[in-house]
Amino acid sequence: MAARNLEKMASIDAQLRLLAPGKVSEDDKLIEYDALLLDRFLDILQDLHGEDVREFVQECYEVAADYDGNRNTEKLEELGNMLTSLDPGDSIVVTKSFSNMLSLANLAEEVQIAYRRRIKKLKKGDFADEASATTESDIEETLKRLLQLNKTPEEVFDALKNQTVDLVLTAHPTQSVRRSLLQKFGRIRDCLTQLYAKDITPDDKQELDEALQREIQAAFRTDEIRRTPPTPQDEMRAGMSYFHETIWKGVPKFLRRVDTALKNIGINERVPYNAPLIQFSSWMGGDRDGNPRVTPEVTRDVCLLARMMAANLYFSQIEDLMFEMSMWRCNEELRVRAERQRCAKRDAKHYIEFWKQIPANEPYRAILGDVRDKLYNTRERARQLLSSGVSDVPEDAVFTSVDQFLEPLELCYRSLCDCGDRPIADGSLLDFLRQVSTFGLALVKLDIRQESERHSDVLDAITTHLGIGSYKEWSEDKRQEWLLSELSGKRPLFGPDLPKTEEVADVLDTFKVISELPSDSFGAYIISMATAPSDVLAVELLQRECGITDPLRVVPLFEKLADLESAPAAVARLFSIEWYRNRINGKQEVMIGYSDSGKDAGRLSAAWQLYKTQEELVKVAKEYGVKLTMFHGRGGTVGRGGGPTHLAILSQPPDTIHGQLRVTVQGEVIEQSFGEEHLCFRTLQRFTAATLEHGMHPPVSPKPEWRVLMDEMAIIATEEYRSVVFKEPRFVEYFRLATPELEYGRMNIGSRPSKRKPSGGIESLRAIPWIFAWTQTRFHLPVWLGFGGAFKRVIQKDSKNLNMLKEMYNQWPFFRVTIDLVEMVFAKGDPGIAALYDRLLVSEELQPFGEQLRVNYQETRRLLLQVAGHKDILEGDPYLRQRLQLRDPYITTLNVCQAYTLKQIRDPSFHVKVRPHLSKDYMESSPAAELVKLNPKSEYAPGLEDTVILTMKGIAAGMQNTG
């Protein structure tokens, strides 16, 4: 029996192998990695749930692969009938299996990419496709490229040490994988990497194989579904875990690589440790826009938590540094200080190392011992404040400023250099100094974000209380006049007797929390929906009134298309106010939002408007002599401004970055950017290299005739997009039927509600669920809608325009990136799948609507390829094509399962014939039956809700971008 079994399994696996795409090149290990993980997974599935379940999963895979090969829609129906015949327990097991197999395919892909990079480093550059625009910027290659463009090494070094990239981590509700699983995936990745190492012994191999099996099984046995929504504190802790695991050690490691790259172009200096190359900020616990769960208490907790973590991370490293610093030779300044501290030392028995008095011939250790005491106290103070709000640790026993913390470390550094021990100084001590300069005492700077309307409410309460009228009814000029007269005066505006609604109290309490915490805990105060100068002045006034001694910089955020268009004028009006110019000291930051502008007008018009707005803003800033920093609020998906980092940076308009870049790293992208050490390194390298290159070798400015054509196309694209999304009276109804948008809220991804207002149409829906829903059905409507109409109309008007579009694609980075990203989305899309959702879920009279959209999809795809000069989608990127082909059968199965399950949830009259349970030994306590019990509170038939949520998570993993 066992032998026959094995034979049968092998033959099915052989069949599966035939369905997999072929290798692309010598360096292509992807098929092997994928096969290994898949085999391990199927063996585990058979052990846990029996042979029939394994066979069923393989049959589903084959039917789906068959559909992906020839797009025969009958196969989708066959697959649908197979999946709906399962009982609730089996349905969850099968869905979970496909979701897991997809995650494993993603891991195989990551290991393959890392492997090819290593090979490329060893072979150095014989990859034709690696040189194309789709690869990232290696710091060393970037420096060499700049020298080829006739920059001197000194100019490059000067630009590099003066630039800043500030990465702002946000807890957008799109990280749909639980942390428990992310950690297991990390270990699977490690096992896989080691298994294919050259010098591996048979014993090692066997142990690694066992570890691999163990981790795959542990991941499969973990409940993928969050049963309760995360709180903002949970999101913050999840975000902070990346500092712990990769970013903390990753920054000094990356800066060493920059030093090496500089050495290779003839610069024998290191990047100064206080050069602010990389900075980190966060929105977790500070972003209250539309999230009532972020209260002033949350903001306070999050700041104290980050300070405690920072002190803890330094503390865990300081003893290692003390071990290294055993030298006796030092300069006079240090010797005097060390002697003074050695004599004043109390015993330190609660430390593990160096607990007795430090001997006189170890002066560095005496200095660092004092630093250790202060770090211990700093951590304790933050911990006590966090748990009870009070602390018995006096303030003079802790570090209160970064300069105070750097001073003894700088003293050690100077002393070593004075005594000829520079190589020692440039070891761990330099790394430590760089960490202190990058992370400070606060670990990350917290941005506060609030809607402009909420500030107006507070001021309205104040003016009404003062009896001078209603602030909200005043004109913009009157508001400005009053705000400026108050800002120039000294009198307090209101006392404790101000009558406050809950909302007003919340805004004022937030300012109060800011005034009570150390100012280095905070970054910017961002005002969403900002339209006028009074929005900014209002925040300046409230900061002063609430006693914030070191006010946060105020950053207006422009999101909707109309706001972007009027942003330059609004900023010019702001700069024309003398009081404000004196306040900002020649520096201003402006944030531009990608998600809402895309939802508002479609991708083409939004991208072009963002481009033009940045150019205009830079002009305005130059006119007033202000240095402008653009803060890019990009999402993870293409519909929300996502896409490969280096390309996005290099396609920004010339002069808009100037060595200062601030950009959000959102939810699901945090894991892709910082989940592993090598990913963290790559992310820091990409941002730094691309920012440097953009500043020193800016992309070309578009020719005047390109601009005219873009303007024309943007108008047509907006018109087409809005005619469907906003003007079509039954569009919202169609959207809610054709996608899982209504079910999205059950995923418990984020702490933020998915709608701004409970009822209402597309306007009130957040940009994230809007895109999430279209990504699920693989129709990606918000990304491509508008492109087709625009291309078609300008080509019909004048056939020469086609050649101009081709010229734009070949010569203008911005246009190329915009088109390439849409092409990538077409590679992941499948109108056949969208048609299946329509057929099952959309009422008959709305069916033609979907058909029309699918015709538009195909037409847009055809025109896009024509403009790009490609015969087929992704013909220039065989690797990406192969990777997408590998994933397709898994995603197709999950899509079919989702569509049919939604049908069962929404249509009580939809009857299915359930087949007997797959595992022979079925009883109430079997593994499959227990899965159904994980969700006892569901309002649907057993198992349906979990099945839908699992398909959502699986498809999100397959698309590699959720919202």
Swiss-Prot record:
InterPro entries: PEP_COase (IPR021135), PEP_COase_bac/pln-type (IPR022805), PEP_COase_Lys_AS (IPR018129), PEPCASE_His_AS (IPR033129), Pyrv/PenolPyrv_kinase-like_dom (IPR015813)
Keywords tagged on the record: Allosteric enzyme, Carbon dioxide fixation, Cytoplasm, Lyase, Magnesium, Phosphoprotein, Photosynthesis
Catalysed reactions listed for this entry: oxaloacetate + phosphate = phosphoenolpyruvate + hydrogencarbonate
Database matches in SUPFAM superfamilies: Phosphoenolpyruvate/pyruvate domain (SSF51621)
Residue positions of the active site: H172, K599
Activity regulation statement: By light-reversible phosphorylation.
Enzyme class at the top of the EC tree: lyase
Cysteine pairings via disulfide bonds: none
Pfam families with a match to the protein in the record: PEPcase
EC number(s) stated in the UniProt entry for this protein: 4.1.1.31
Chief subcellular location: cytoplasm
Cofactor(s), names only, from the UniProt record: Mg(2+)
Sequence intervals crossing the membrane: none
One annotated GO biological process: photosynthesis
Modified residues (Phosphoserine): S11, S701
GO CC, any one term: chloroplast
Single GO MF annotation: phosphoenolpyruvate carboxylase activity
Cited function: Through the carboxylation of phosphoenolpyruvate (PEP) it forms oxaloacetate, a four-carbon dicarboxylic acid source for the tricarboxylic acid cycle.
PANTHER family the record matches: PHOSPHOENOLPYRUVATE CARBOXYLASE, PHOSPHOENOLPYRUVATE CARBOXYLASE 2
Homology family: Belongs to the PEPCase type 1 family.
NCBIfam families (alphabetical): PRK00009.1 (NF000584)
Protein name listed in UniProt: Phosphoenolpyruvate carboxylase 2
Lineage, highest ranks first: Eukaryota, Viridiplantae, Streptophyta, Embryophyta, Tracheophyta
